[in-house]
Amino acid sequence: MALYDRANSRNAYAEDSLLRESELVSFVKTTYKFFAGSLLLATIGALLGLMNFQAVVQYKWVFFIAEIAAFFGLMFSKSKPGLNLFMLFAFTSLSGVTLVPLLGMVIAKAGLGAIWQALGMTTIVFGLMSVYALKTKNDLANMGKMLFIALIVVVVCSLINLFLGSPMFQVVIAGASAILFSLYIAYDTQNIVKGMYDSPIDAAVSLYLDFLNVFISILQIIGIFSDRDT
């Protein structure tokens, strides 16, 4: 008779749905806590780096290699609670330090206000794209392949411009990168609220990289156009 007890079946389904919804809410909250912590530690890393500007510039490749090592350490420690959080914060702290040469260049050309301008613009973009991801009825998962192909194109163009050294080509690359990672913000945000990530740390590092790359792109554009004005 239990097979035909529709009330019990509905109650069990409702309880299961509520449980899954509660778990997802907890997942999203934890993700954004880790994301906020990552931004905070990156800011601290950048401030400490600016206070020791000459040393950071002199050993910038050492810090860059350390950042890459921390990133791969984070990837390999995904399934190790505690260690993965440590590697996340180590990576984000080092990424703040490696921003110092770019920050110093922009400050020298456009002043400290340009940093706040870039940060404000990045925050606005992040907020708008996050809201779009939550409000849209479109399934942004279909963008995944297109975004990945665009990412490869941007990386290849960036490598080519290392040899060309063209400021205007760099503006095009930075503009394309800003648009690309703005779209990634929406893409990753929707994936997070759909529960597509294995852990909050995976989700947080995706959001952090999106935010960081939009910020870097805007800084590069400001720096190049400030140079043209001088």
Curated annotation (Swiss-Prot):
One of its GO terms (biological process) is regulation of proteolysis. The chain crosses the membrane at residues 34-54, 56-76, 87-107, 111-131, 146-166, 167-187, 205-225. Pfam families: Bax1-I. Keywords: Cell membrane, Membrane, Transmembrane, Transmembrane helix. InterPro entries: Bax_inhibitor_1-related. It is found in: Cell membrane. It is a multi-pass membrane protein. GO terms for cellular component: plasma membrane. Signal peptide: none annotated. GO terms for molecular function: calcium channel activity. Belongs to the BI1 family. PANTHER family: BAX INHIBITOR-RELATED, MODULATOR OF FTSH PROTEASE YCCA. This is Uncharacterized protein HP_0920. It comes from Helicobacter pylori (strain ATCC 700392 / 26695) (Campylobacter pylori).
